[in-house]
Amino acid sequence: MQLSTSEISELIKSRLENFSTSAEARTQGTVISVTDGIVRIHGLSNVMAGEMIEFPGNVYGLALNLERDSVGAVILGDYENISEGDTVKCTGRILEVPVGPELVGRVVNALGQPIDGKGPINAKLTDKIEKVAPGVIARKSVSQPVQTGIKAIDSMVPVGRGQRELIIGDRQTGKTAVAVDAIINQKGQNMTCIYVAIGQKASTIANVVRKLEEHGAMEYTIVVAASASDPAALQFLAPYAGCTMGEYFRDRGQDALIVYDDLTKQAWAYRQISLLLRRPPGREAYPGDVFYIHSRLLERAARVNEEYVEKFTNGEVKGKTGSLTALPIIETAAGDVSAFVPTNVISITDGQIFLETDLFNAGIRPAINAGISVSRVGGAAQTKVIKKLGGGVRLALAQYRELAAFAQFASDLDEVTRKQLDRGRLVTELMKQAQYAPLSTSEMAVTLLAANKGFFDDVPVARALAFESALHSFLKSKYKSILDKIDSTNDLGGDDEKALEAAIQDFKATNAY
């Protein structure tokens, strides 16, 4: 088939008339220098603070320093293939991570990418890692308990849903153990848990994940891991990513618990980034806004009211409050709680659980110092039965510590002092607890009632824990109905108390311990 010249020219003309190009306006810049994961870029005139920047090879960065003629950005990932002269583009987006129930049971990095080898995560939603905390009007007071299963915490420093309770202590004092036990005890409590590991050894994180799997806790837990080998940028961002994942549940009228292990290493990572960006250093070489990085993170842990949840879900969820409870961990050096970061976080949180090296080495584990551990809002959330029976525990320990110091000098002690010392020794022994063995509310109530009513008085202190364990086993097999009632009502009525006392007497009469 031959085409005439006129037909060819008509065809070309029609093609030219219908030709269209879609132009995309994008700000571009050029890499000036790359050092230690920090990139200086020239030419990104419209970049926003905290905006994602795209490098060649599908690598992204975060704009942190906006200067007159250059931009300082931190690279999220490997920077070996980035070199001077590379073209950089603005994305117009803020960093987001995947959120939703699809992440539960998985181990992800600070960007929400799976690192457990179990395949991709098909999350339907993503959310910004930096969000404004709920305002005062949107909040509700803390009134529901978080049962940690640890006697010393639930009786002396109770934690409520929506609270921020700091766990602080030197290295190797059992901080992670307390937090992991609290996660294990949330089984069947309608609580989604997020464990954020910051700057830890990969082997340590793997060990925690294995323990959570062994106790069936990964069924309701998300692990966000930024190990010591990850770039400082990811260690800095991991807590915010974990918090966003927790807020997904909070905002939909559910309860979530998040553990930041630990925020000291996040502050170190931020200090490293800030110094490399040439920001002016302040106290202990931290930048001036190190308080703000922790306050804006921890203020996002809250209990939100029904109206907030209803508005957020467009009326799909009604009459439900949501909560995000935070257990931040801070590592001190030689017990110095007056250092910069510890004092910052103490002032932000609603109380602290202070773990001491001396107590830990003396075999008192969890090594909680009852004198300076406090819960500022958790008292209102404590379960009725523990509040009723555990009131004397803190007092007994405080009196014991005081009297024990004097007893070293006094040779002859009066009867009252001797009784107080004996009771203090007993309570100290009873507050000991094995790792990965959280107790139910009823088991705790049994121990506290037996201690209050003098059932331990004729038991040698060294045998107290064996007596307690045997008593729990006996009651579970013979008097399970009483324990079930305590667990379901979280209270102990007069008749139930008498029945429980009779059951303990039955145990003492018929069992060797």
Curated annotation (Swiss-Prot):
It is a peripheral membrane protein. One of its GO terms (cellular component) is plasma membrane. InterPro entries: ATP_synth_asu-like_sf, ATP_synth_asu_C, ATP_synth_asu_C_sf, ATP_synth_F1_a_nt-bd_dom, ATP_synth_F1_asu, ATPase_a/bsu_AS, ATPase_F1/V1/A1_a/bsu_N, ATPase_F1/V1/A1_a/bsu_N_sf. The record marks S373 as: Required for activity. The keyword Cell membrane applies. Belongs to the ATPase alpha/beta chains family. NCBIfam families: atpA (TIGR00962), PRK13343.1 (NF009884). This is ATP synthase subunit alpha.
